Curated annotation (Swiss-Prot):
Family from the record: Belongs to the lyase 1 family. Argininosuccinate lyase subfamily.
Gene3D superfamilies: Fumarase/aspartase (C-terminal domain) (1.10.40.30), Fumarase/aspartase (Central domain) (1.20.200.10), Fumarase/aspartase (N-terminal domain) (1.10.275.10)
Enzyme class: lyase
Membrane-crossing segments per the record: none
Annotated protein name in UniProt: Argininosuccinate lyase
GO CC annotations on file: cytosol
Keywords carried by this UniProt record: Amino-acid biosynthesis, Arginine biosynthesis, Cytoplasm, Lyase
Gene Ontology biological process terms in this record: arginine biosynthetic process via ornithine; L-arginine biosynthetic process
A molecular function GO annotation: argininosuccinate lyase activity
HAMAP family xref list: Arg_succ_lyase
Source organism: Chlorobium luteolum (strain DSM 273 / BCRC 81028 / 2530)
Pathway: Amino-acid biosynthesis; L-arginine biosynthesis; L-arginine from L-ornithine and carbamoyl phosphate: step 3/3
Subcellular location: Cytoplasm
Length: 461
């Protein structure tokens, strides 16, 4: 192999490109990840060129054979891109020239690096969307299993991080099921826009060669073909949308991780994480830290940064292609890899968590979270809700001042606040009764949770 690095555009210039400028502008250390997609796109392009008679069938065959050999060389480490190569497209084309000679120069007929890299990026995103979908579907399955396991367990529901009302633990897990399911729907919707071939747009204005863009789209399994050559090479909105989807996934993970971190702390003590997903302290022997959950929570900020980076890169660019767009790869790769690995590891961690049901049972029995049941009990007695709310607030205040749990307040004391109280109030003041009595659609009642679990299982097939 020759050590001479030939830049694809150098013939126009009388002076060699400054070495520091080349090092600064080289992207091969980043876009090297796209070698499979680049070779896949080039094979499709060469096949089409041969079929359309733009190049000979022999040249097309030689190009495709050489590209497949180069793919193996990169995979085995025989061919290692260097920064002097500028980008992965240059690496592959220069190596192809070394392997098959002048025929390699025909590969780029009717093609620009602009539509080439746009194609590579879409192929990459298509694969990452499928991987992220698969990871999310696995997580959805775990959430349904958790909901089934803990459907009869009672935990606190929170607002403002204050205990609010008792709920079925299954209802809690199903809340996250719905969030992550919407993430899969967003990705599926995005896939329709990603799966559009830009190959054939050339630099931005098309080509005078009789390219068959529909054929390359077919060979690359794209479902649609671009309609405007400028748009095909100059926008990165689908990339931004993908990172946005990753950001929402990470936001949902981060919220879930926050619950796990809090609930596994000594102060809460609701949940236990397996030792396999916990770490200790180098100085405090007693520590058991939820580091994996904390790391996922921290990585969320990084993916948000990827989204802001892309929005900022694109915000002032005139049509069509600009070299600024080279900077789209680090945010894309980072957000995809972070989201996929985070969902995968979170799912494994979640599978190895358990609720501390005995502690939760004791806490929910004697808690102020049953106050709403008093207010709704009064409403059922034909007391206007605002009056019921005011009366219940006074009862709660008395309960706190006298250190008496709501279920332990004597009936005569209840009747001092309102004469409509009778023995039925004590039937309502249990966590089980609170949950069972919920009648509204999608509520936390045990019956509703059972229905939600069935629907979730049907959704997953």
């Amino acid at each position: 192999m020759s050590n001479k690095k030939e830049l694809l555009w150098a013939s126009r210039f009388n002076e060699p490109f400054d070495s520091e400028a080349l090092r600064f502008s080289s992207s091969v250390h980043v876009d090297g990840k796209l070698y499979r997609e680049d070779i896949q796109g080039s094979i499709a392009h060469a096949t089409m060129l041969g079929e359309e008679g733009i190049i000979s069938a022999d040249d097309a065959h030689a190009i495709c054979r050489g590209l497949k050999e180069i793919e193996k060389e990169i995979e085995t480490g025989t061919l290692v891109p260097q920064w002097e190569d500028e980008d992965i497209h240059t690496v592959i084309e220069n190596r192809l020239k070394e392997k098959i000679g002048a025929a390699a120069g025909k590969l780029h007929s009717g093609r620009s690096r602009n539509d080439q890299v746009a194609t590579d990026t879409r192929l990459y995103m298509r694969e990452r969307i499928e991987e992220l979908q698969e990871a999310l579907n696995d997580l959805l399955g775990t959430l349904v299993q958790k909901a089934e396991t803990y459907k009869d367990s009672i935990i606190f529901g929170y607002t403002h991080l204050q205990r609010a009302q008792p709920i079925s633990a299954g209802h809690y897990y199903l809340a996250y099921f719905n969030m992550f399911n919407r993430d899969t729907e967003r990705l599926l919707d995005l896939l329709m826009r990603v799966n559009v071939s830009p190959l054939g747009a050339a630099a931005f204005a098309g080509s005078t060669l009789p390219l068959n863009a529909g054929r390359t789209a077919e060979l690359l399994d794209f479902s649609e073909l671009f309609t405007n050559s400028i748009d095909a090479v100059s926008d990165r909105d689908i990339l931004i949308e993908f990172i946005s989807c990753c950001s929402i996934v990470m936001m949902h993970l981060s919220r879930f991780c926050e619950d796990i971190i809090l609930w596994s702390s000594y102060e809460f003590g609701y949940l236990e994480i397996s030792d396999a997903f916990s770490t200790g302290s180098s100085i405090m022997p007693q520590k058991k830290n939820a580091d994996i959950a904390e790391l996922i929570r921290g990585k969320t900020g990084r993916v948000y940064g990827d989204l802001m980076a892309m929005l900022t890169i694109m915000k002032g660019l005139p049509l069509s292609y600009n070299r600024d767009m080279q900077e789209d790869k680090p945010p894309l790769f980072d957000s995809a890899e972070t989201a996929i690995s985070s969902v995968t590891l979170f799912n494994r961690m979640l599978q190895h968590t358990r609720l501390r049901e005995e502690r939760l049972k004791e806490l929910t029995k004697k808690d102020l979270s049953l106050a709403t049941e008093i207010a709704e009990y009064l409403v059922k007695k034909d007391v206007p809700f605002r009056d019921a709310h005011r009366i219940t607030g006074k009862i709660v205040s008395w309960s706190i001042e006298n250190q008496t749990p709501l279920p332990d307040i004597p009936l005569e004391r209840f009747r001092e606040f309102s004469e409509v109280f009778d023995e039925g109030i004590f039937t309502a003041l249990t966590p089980e009764a609170s949950i069972t009595s919920k009648k509204s659609h999608g509520s936390c009642s045990f019956e509703s949770v059972e229905r939600q679990i069935r629907e979730a299982r049907e959704l997953l097939g």
